[in-house]
UniProtKB/Swiss-Prot annotation:
Disulfide bonds: none annotated. It comes from the Eukaryota. The gene is psbN. Belongs to the PsbN family. HAMAP family: PSII_PsbN. It is a single-pass membrane protein. One of its GO terms (biological process) is photosynthesis. This is Protein PsbN.
Length: 44
C-alpha cells in the first residue's frame, strides 16, 4: 500500500468515475432541460 502507483490508480479511477457520473447527470438529469437540440432547430 506504500506504492505511489496504487494511490494514483485509485485517484484516476475515482476521477474518471466522477466525470462519467457528472456527464450522465448533465445529459439526463434536470440540467438537460437547458440543452439545445440542433435537430429540433433545423427545419426541413
Amino acid at each position: 500500500m506504500d506504492n505511489p502507483a496504487f494511490f494514483f490508480t485509485i485517484f484516476l479511477w475515482f476521477f474518471l468515475l466522477s466525470i462519467t457520473a457528472y456527464s450522465i447527470y448533465v445529459g439526463f438529469g434536470p440540467p438537460s432541460k437547458r440543452l439545445r437540440d440542433p435537430f429540433e432547430e433545423h427545419e426541413d
